[in-house]
Curated annotation (Swiss-Prot):
GO molecular function: adenylate kinase activity; ATP binding
Protein name per UniProt: Adenylate kinase
Recorded domain comment: Consists of three domains, a large central CORE domain and two small peripheral domains, NMPbind and LID, which undergo movements during catalysis. The LID domain closes over the site of phosphoryl transfer upon ATP binding. Assembling and dissambling the active center during each catalytic cycle provides an effective means to prevent ATP hydrolysis.
Quaternary structure and interacting proteins, as annotated: Monomer.
Highest taxon listed in the record's lineage: Bacteria
Signal peptide interval: none
Keywords: ATP-binding, Cytoplasm, Kinase, Nucleotide biosynthesis, Nucleotide-binding, Transferase
NMP: region residues: 30-59
Residues where ATP binds: 10-15, 128, 137-138, 195
A GO BP entry: AMP salvage
Principal subcellular localisation of the protein: cytoplasm
Length: 212
């Protein structure tokens, strides 16, 4: 089975990816792992990626696409299939992936799209607060401290609502054309992500069992 998993930050994509890999024994291909492996093994694309990262520069699309192609060319993929997680991030990368899969003779069989309302993601992602003295982490809504006094807690810049909203807006703008691209191919399976983790996986499991 050859799959993509998509969803906004905080939608539970990583959790569900781990469950899919465990249940269906496909190779989990996450962007971060792929980059680390390519650099550690000093592949042609890995060496190139490292040269950009060492200079603090963004890795260009063609290098990222090359690293994905290197990974998808490996023997285990033919045996197990794959779950791509964190790629493609742009419509240009989606077109590059189409080309790579065609060249390798691999067919993409499904795109799992975990849908969660952006407003509830904003609440989920921007609620984290940290105690100034103890460093303990709490959540304003889901795990509030018993003796909450606003002055005793702070938020990291990354967790502030305006920062989170910007991040979500960017992800929505980049993700929508990708979903539309795969929807036109009849590959997208929308999964309601605003429910218990196990219920989300149960819905995914039904979809994937029918694909097998």
């Amino acid at each position: 089975m050859n799959l993509l998993i998509m969803g906004l930050p905080g939608a539970g994509k990583g959790t569900q990816a781990a469950k899919i890999v465990e249940q269906f024994h496909v190779a989990h291909i996450s962007t971060g792992d792929m980059f680390r492996a390519a650099m550690a093994n000093q592949t042609e694309m890995g060496v190139l990626a490292k040269s950009y990262i060492d200079k603090g520069e963004l890795v260009p699309d063609e290098v990222t696409n090359g690293i994905v192609k290197e990974r998808l060319s490996q023997d285990d993929i033919k045996e197990t299939g794959f779950l791509l997680d964190g790629y493609p991030r742009t419509i240009e990368q989606a077109h590059a992936l189409d080309k790579t899969l065609a060249e390798l003779g691999i067919e993409l069989e499904g795109v799992i799209n975990i849908e969660v309302n952006p407003d509830s993601l904003l609440e989920r992602l921007s609620g984290r607060i940290i105690h100034r003295v103890t460093g303990e982490t709490f959540h304003k809504v889901f795990n509030p401290p018993v003796d909450y006094k606003e002055e005793d807690y702070y938020q990291r810049e990354d967790d502030k609502p305006e920062t989170v909203k910007r991040r979500l807006d960017v992800n929505i703008a980049q993700g929508e054309p990708i979903i539309a691209h795969y929807r036109a191919k009849g590959l997208v399976h929308d999964i309601e992500g605003n429910q218990d983790i196990n219920d989300v996986f149960s819905d995914i499991e039904k979809v994937l069992t029918n694909l097998k």
